[in-house]
């Protein structure tokens, strides 16, 4: 939109040299109001509007035009209706050999087929594969999902248990576990976004997924 929230967002992005595209003056900018008691979040109030197919066409055209020169594409799906055609984004990126990093949403991951990597949390992953009964079951179902969706890798975030990476390597799918360090955390907002942004940035800079 062109409201106060949009102005603040553009200023914050501009301070980090990030360009913002596709402003729609008729829309209310999606924003979230968090009510806190001390450092604990009690409630969150969201303000948002759904998107139309016409608006998605503008997004598709802008996406295709701006792809040149990029090292990675991050698709962070919040389930707000903005990402009408994720397969299109993946297809356009793959034409230019640009890896697509996806933070998924919902209980149907088929639309993410062909992405380089997806980064669901454990609940999202478990829901998608019909539940997890053990660590070996976790590994088997992760490998099946990678094959089904033609992914190069799968990173599952597991809260206090850290993260688990499954990655294709010379015809095999290897598992790597990354434990967490104990810390007092009062607000986990944006944790998934931080993971995928850090992962894509590091990997695009030449680091391996394991080191990223």
Sequence positions of predicted segments:
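Short acidic, glycine-rich surface-loop motifs adjacent to enzyme active sites
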Residues: 69-82
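Substrate-binding N-lobe of the ribokinase-like
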Residues: 1-31
């Amino acid at each position: 939109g062109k409201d106060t929230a949009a102005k603040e967002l553009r200023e914050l992005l501009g301070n980090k040299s990030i360009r913002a595209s596709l402003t729609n003056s008729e829309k209310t900018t999606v924003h979230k109001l968090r009510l806190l008691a001390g450092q604990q979040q009690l409630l969150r109030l969201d303000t948002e509007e759904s998107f139309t197919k016409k608006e998605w066409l503008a997004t598709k055209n802008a996406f295709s035009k701006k792809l040149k020169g990029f090292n990675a594409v991050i698709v962070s799906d919040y389930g707000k209706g903005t990402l009408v055609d994720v397969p299109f984004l993946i297809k356009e990126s793959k034409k230019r050999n640009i890896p697509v990093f996806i933070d998924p949403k919902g209980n149907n991951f088929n639309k993410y087929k062909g992405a380089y990597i997806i980064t669901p949390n454990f609940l999202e992953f478990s829901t998608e594969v019909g539940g997890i009964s053990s660590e070996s079951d976790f590994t088997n179902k992760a490998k099946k999902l990678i094959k089904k969706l033609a992914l190069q890798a799968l990173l599952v975030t597991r809260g206090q248990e850290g993260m688990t990476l499954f990655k294709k390597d010379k015809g095999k799918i290897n598992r790597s576990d990354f434990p967490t360090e104990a810390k007092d955390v009062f607000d986990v907002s944006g944790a998934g976004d931080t993971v995928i942004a850090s992962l894509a940035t590091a990997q695009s800079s030449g680091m391996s997924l394991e080191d990223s």
